[in-house]
């Protein structure tokens, strides 16, 4: 009889042939970086809408027996039954708010099925696997920057990712958080994660903060491309040294490897590119510059 766990691994990832691509190093060439006023224009308030209303409430009554960062969340999301509550508004892909229940435990979550993804000309499909991979990378590094995210093969609309819903302060985003000194270390950690994951869509609104001042990174599907595609709003730390904790975690990753979970989710080319990025960031020892002024997502929030 076939092993169902082995079959699930095959369903999650099919190995493909690849040609190794060199790692793009120009982000670290400071002499090529033009320090002019054009970059600062991207931060002007008139380029994104600031919500002047009072603190927003969650669009439904949040209730859960398991919190987003709890160890029990992985078991709940991996094995719980899924009930679709509704379609999330303003999402570029099919994204659903769901309720996950297992025994007496329950929590809301975000479900992103593969069948709801819009094809992209410059990015491979199965973005949901990259959502899971970003969580697994954050977990393996000990960063804790991404809400618990699991792969579900059996789900209402087919295979996809399931991520713990964060009851965040939704009026907040990166541009309201970056000047708070007590959050700097968390933001630097997230910046380091995005460098390794090659995040191509780190908008300001993808940085959430909860009532405990924990920063969470969501919408991580555009990541782990084997080509250099870094696009992020987090450039405030350019030239600053990597935090010791982040550097030590990267070194440990290089010594121990990506781990079985990431290997199942990424192609061999993506795995090698991830390790090359880690080596490069660690070797440089500081956060890179955007020498082009174009490595930003749009819209910014």
What are these regions (language model features)?
Residues 1-11, 26, 31, 41-301:
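Phosphate/dinucleotide-binding and metal-coordinating scaffold of catalytic cores
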Residues 15:
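Intrinsically disordered, low-complexity mixed-charge segments
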